[in-house]
From Swiss-Prot:
Coiled coil (UniProt feature): 241-307
Domain of life: Eukaryota
Residue span(s) of domain Arf-GAP: 11-127
Pfam families: ArfGap
Localisation per UniProt entry: Cytoplasm; Golgi apparatus membrane
Positions carrying N-acetylalanine: 2
GO molecular function: GTPase activator activity; zinc ion binding
Required for interaction with coatomer: annotated segments: 97-520
Name the UniProt record assigns to this protein: ADP-ribosylation factor GTPase-activating protein 2
Name of the gene this protein is made from: Arfgap2
Subunit structure: Interacts with the coatomer complex. Interacts with the C-terminal appendage domain of COPG1.
Modified residues annotated as Phosphoserine in this record: 140, 145, 200, 236, 239, 311, 333, 339, 363, 431-432, 512
Species whose genome carries this gene: Rattus norvegicus
Keyword Ribonucleoprotein carried by entry: no
Membrane-related topology note: Peripheral membrane protein
Length: 520
């Protein structure tokens, strides 16, 4: 196995490689004088970027110092010779890898291909040149400095060396007059050359000016090449017009999309409503078919209890057809039993079909009012009074209304006051018992009862207090003897409301039973 390169050879090689203009800046960030190198890619890096490469791992980038490390191998040196910042930049740019992030850049397909290429070129150069320090394109680099004898000061500054002209002139053309002129100047005497003191040093001056002029573009390219794209760009009026037009087009497109979405939502809603209407119509036809299949008595019972959909009365409507008002005529007997305040009640509450959970059962008692209007049910004589005609002008506020009891009491008190005036007109003093007639009547009745029972051997409480009807049991008890007329009216109203509530509850129970067990 061949021995590794010596420290002097390593320093000489890197001194030459770092003298190349493209290798004088960091490959990643462009910092000046990089002193670290990535052997995997053959590029030169600054100390900060070398730390980033170390964090990527040795499988992606292997880092060494060009000044501190002395254990370089010949394969590593060949990789640095065949690589370089210029070659790496051209390869990455050619394969479209322009990312600045190190993790993205060196994990890309272009980085993988360049790693393989550098490894192959380094192995080929090592196999061809062995342990030679320079390869073909660098053989003449260290041999350009022969021993200098006594050189003339003017000759050094008027004639450029061959490697400078080759490096600065890319076309490789040289002026042929310079060698002949230099040889003719060196032949007469070895003393100092005084040709520059003459009147025509035009050729040499033109050469010097051309050399200086050719170095300026290279220097400008190195320092400012990466900052040309950061300048400001002038915006014309035409660009503003184009931007405004694009914004208007985008706004119109957005409005059209919103309108289309709204239209689609409406169409879907209409379709769902139509489907619901069709389902309702199918359910109604099924109920009608079930009702038609029932026999006579069962069908009558179902219609009477409100179980069928066909026998609905009063005001109703269907969602499957147009709105139609179906009014029911109220019987005369029901009209006569309503009071003045019944004008504000809802008509036909029980006739609108089966009750719902949201219905109020406390406002549904007036439907059965016609059942309690007969006189035989109460065992009393009904005083029929002609109800006055109710008009808008006759309706009074609640605060101004007087109940029937107050009106009766006011009439009775008026009669009693007139009779009392006539009876006690000449009396000087009267008592409350005398005014109301309690004292005389009670004493007379007590005396008469005692006289009647004076000869009997046993008496009962009914005989003592005169309860003849209770003792014989032949009479009938009526509410007229217990309650006044106004209280009877209120009592009847309460019974009507209770009966209505019971009817609503019974109807709801029957409907729930039909819904639960009707399909079996």
């Amino acid at each position: 196995m061949a021995a590794g390169p010596s420290k002097s050879e390593i320093q000489t090689l890197f001194k030459r490689l770092r003298a190349i203009p493209t290798n004088k800046a960091c490959f990643d960030c462009g910092a000046k004088s990089p002193s670290w190198a990535s052997i995997t890619y053959g590029v030169f890096l600054c100390i900060d970027c070398s730390g980033v490469h170390r964090s990527l791992g040795v499988h992606l980038s292997f880092i060494r110092s060009t000044e501190l490390d002395s254990n370089w191998s010949w394969l590593q040196l060949r990789c640095m010779q065949v690589g370089g910042n210029a070659n790496a930049t051209a390869f990455f740019r050619q394969h479209g890898c322009l990312a600045n992030d190190a993790n993205t850049k060196y994990n890309s397909r272009a980085a993988q291909m360049y790693r393989e290429k550098i490894r192959q070129l380094g192995s080929t150069a090592l196999a061809r040149h062995g342990t030679d320090l320079w390869i073909d394109n660098m053989n003449s680099a260290p041999s350009h400095s022969p021993e200098k004898k006594d050189s003339d000061f003017f000759t050094e500054h008027t004639q450029a060396p061959a490697w400078d002209t080759a490096a600065t002139d890319p076309s490789g053309t040289q002026q042929p007059a310079l060698p002949s002129e230099s040889s003719s100047l060196a032949q007469p005497e070895p003393g100092p050359n005084t040709d520059l003191l003459g009147t025509s040093p035009q050729a040499s001056l033109e050469l010097k000016s051309s050399i200086i002029g050719k170095k300026k573009p290279a220097a400008a390219k190195k320092g400012l090449g990466a900052k040309k794209g950061l300048g400001a760009q002038k915006v014309s009026n035409q660009s503003f017009t184009e931007i405004e037009r694009q914004a208007q087009v985008a706004e119109k497109l957005r409005e059209q999309q919103a309108a289309d979405a709204k239209k689609q939502a409406e169409e879907s809603m209409v379709a769902s409503m139509r489907l619901a209407y069709q389902e309702l119509q199918i359910d109604r036809k099924k109920e009608e078919k079930k009702l038609q299949n029932l026999e006579g008595k069962k069908r009558e019972q179902a219609e009477r209890l409100g179980m069928g959909l066909v026998s609905r009365s009063s005001i109703s409507h269907s969602v499957l057809s147009e709105m139609q008002m179906i009014e029911q005529e109220t019987p005369l007997s029901a009209k006569s039993s309503r009071s003045q305040l019944d004008l504000f009640d809802d008509v036909g509450t029980f006739a609108s079909g089966p009750p719902k959970y949201k219905d109020n059962p406390f406002s549904l008692g007036e439907t059965f009012g016609s059942r309690w209007d007969s006189d035989a049910a109460w065992g009393m004589d009904r005083v029929e009074e002609k109800e006055p005609e109710v008009t808008i002008s006759s309706i009074r506020p609640i605060s101004e209304r007087t109940t029937s009891r107050r009106e009766v009491e006011s009439r009775i008190s008026g009669l009693e006051s007139s009779e009392a005036r006539q009876k006690f007109a000449g009396a000087k003093a009267i008592s409350s018992d005398m005014f109301f007639g309690r004292e005389v009547d009670s004493e007379y009745e007590a005396r008469s009862r005692l006289q009647q029972l004076s000869g009997s051997s046993a008496i009962s409480s009914s005989d003592l207090f005169g309860d003849v009807d209770g003792a014989h049991g032949g009479g009938t008890v009526s509410l007229g003897n217990v309650l006044p007329t106004a209280d009877i009216a209120q009592f009847k109203q309460g019974v009507k409301s209770v009966a209505g509530k019971m009817a609503v509850l019974a109807n709801g129970v029957m409907n729930s039973l039909q819904d639960r067990y009707g399909s079996y």
